[in-house]
Amino acid sequence: MVHAKHPLPIKIDYFSSLNFRMNATLYIRQALNIPEKSINATLQLLAEDCTIPFISRYRKDKTGNLDEIQIEQIEKLNTQFEDLVKRKNTILKSVEEQSALTPELQQRIEESFDLQELEDLYLPFKKRRKTKADAAKEKGLEPLAKIIMSQKVQDLQFLASKYVNNEVSSEEEALQGARDIMAEWINENMYVRKNLRRMFRQKAVITSKAVKAKKDEEEAQKFSQYFEWEEALSRIPSHRLLAMLRAEAEGFVKIQTGIDKEEAIAFIEHTVIKSDNETSEQITLAIKDSYKRLLEPAISNETLQEAKEKADKKAIEIFSGNLSQLLLAPPLGEKRILAIDPGYKSGCKVVCLDEKGDLLHNETLYPHAPQHESGMAMKKIRSMVNAYHIEAISIGNGTASRETEFFIKKIAFDRPLQVFVVSEAGASVYSASKIARDEFPNYDVTVRGAVSIGRRLADPLAELVKIDAKSIGVGQYQHDVDQSQLKIELDTTVMKCVNSVGINLNTASKSLLSYVSGIGEKTAENIVNYRAENGAFADRKELKKVPRLGEKAFQQAAAFVRITHSTNPLDNSAVHPEAYGIVEQMAKDLGIKTHELIANKEKIALIDPEKYITKDIGILGIRDIIKELEKPGLDPRKAAKVFEFDPSVKKMTDLKTGMVLPGIVNNITAFGCFVDLGIKESGLVHISQLKEGFVSDVNEVVKLHQHVQVKVTEVDEARKRIQLSMIL
């Protein structure tokens, strides 16, 4: 028995109650196929406030070459373990305060490392509102319930009559009270709950039905497929479940989850009823009541919540993957750019930027309807290109984008210029943000938005970190998932991307600096202020002069920042300052200076890595140093490429079934990808149309911003939907 109050037969699951003491390492090892030594080393480094980018890049020899994903998993599982221990201690304290902690119950709580099992153990002791069972116990009916549950042959009417008094008016009321108590016992039975959960996980069906009063509303039509829907919950795709839950949240459908009621009740009867006599009928009634009133609602909600959490996780994974690809999009680099935020009546906002992205000039031109001042606009753009030595043109992909692109390509410039169409998703959010106001206090939102479009071409990572990732528009049901978990994952993704590329310490914005390993918002602000007061950093060591940037922060951050004209050439590489002495020794052994070793493949080939192993830096670290010396400060991002849409397609009505068109992947979901064809509406390539054969993961076939060829298979102008195929 779980505790003395329960006369129910309890079946113990010995596998989950093995008598051993769990620790964090064992808990993590059960979930991950990672050696104990690697887990312990990682936990120690995390406890020392080392960041994941730092550990994965500069502590490979300690962790056994774990990557960022594995280190992140260890960190999450360790937090999960700590939360379980805290919850366990809270439960033990609460039960003890109620003087109900038996040695058996204490042992089961201490040995359990399953949250649901812990909550089931705690269920009888939880503080709650008064229940039917509580009311029956107050009337003195618990002994009657125990006698019935003992399932020995009794004259129940005679037995129940003994409990008739001022508070219990009849034998039936006494039996009803006993059934209420038994129903609660059945609800609290761990074996019953555990196996019902298993049945729900395996067999639950989710159904949705339209809310009649709202089904004819225009907004409801996008959810029309869920007006009458039924599907196995275990097999429902994440995007469909989130869509159904959104439809319910907006009041258009009602959702239910459940299993076959008769099967569930039969299982409970088989578990609880051990005799065939007069008591069986009362216990069966209690079982049916317990299932309908207590078990089914609770476990149904639990199961749906589990499914929602899995769907959230999948959606967040997709969002994070899309964000990573967007942040690591090819940069054009330090070029002088003319950027245009296109428009019709309000005009095209034009800005000229220098190599650092600083604003040189801005004005508004009106080449399109209703003004049609294309001649004047051409003349002014030619003048700006010459005056500011423009090297490339960046056009936002929103309203009037195609018309502006065609207009620009008609201009006869004195020299060849690359013309790029850039996603402007989130540019309006940036332009109205505090960051934008601080950068451009004397300019309005239209100028700030155009500047962002230009800077995105030069360096997407540096510009996009200024925008709330949720505003970039590459997520799947991003507003429906757990928002705190989404923020954690997106922040982690941004941090990974920033540190995989590295940043220029003398030009990086506060936003970009705040994502560098070991540097938060406050320290980033201090760095920017120090730079403003003292000028450019001469070397990495100067970072230590920044207020509140101590030795630990320096250790975590130094190798991720670059100084292009430092007196030490290693400051412009990913070699950590702690390894400078090793590189200097390598150069000395080869009879050359350090700067002569960098990028010198012939000399680097002569280095014996084994010779330079130290107690702090092993063979993996030495090999990374040698690799970095070959190509110091290598940017992992590819080079930007010019892309051209089909000039014959300017609007949806220009599309015809069977057309093969160039496009750019602009969003990836679990069910396929969306492709920009150069018009307002993006087309969908369903996962089944990505390539011949089965595709389990869209990311195996396409990446965000990938240039693709697609065939138009269906155009639905009324619903503004375009179906595409990559099977040509």
Protein language model features and the residues they cover:
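Duplex nucleic acid-engaging cores and interfaces of nucleic-acid transaction enzymes
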Residues: Q70-Q73, Q80, L84-A339, K345-S431, ...
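Accessory alpha-helical DNA-binding modules that contact the DNA backbone or grooves
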Residues: T51-I52, T63, D67-D134, K139-N165, ...
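Low-complexity, acidic/Ser/Thr- and charged residue-rich accessory regions of DNA metabolism proteins
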Residues: S161-E171, W229, I268-Y291, L295, ...
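Short hydrophobic alpha-helical segments enriched in small aliphatic residues
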Residues: A4-P7
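Long, charged amphipathic helices and adjacent flexible linkers at domain junctions
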Residues: E302-S320, S471-N504, Y612-T657
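Long, charge-rich intrinsically disordered scaffolds of nucleic-acid metabolism proteins
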Residues: F420, G426, S431-V501, N506
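C-terminal accessory/binding modules appended to enzymatic or scaffolding proteins
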Residues: I34, P330-L332, M495-N529, P647-V685, ...
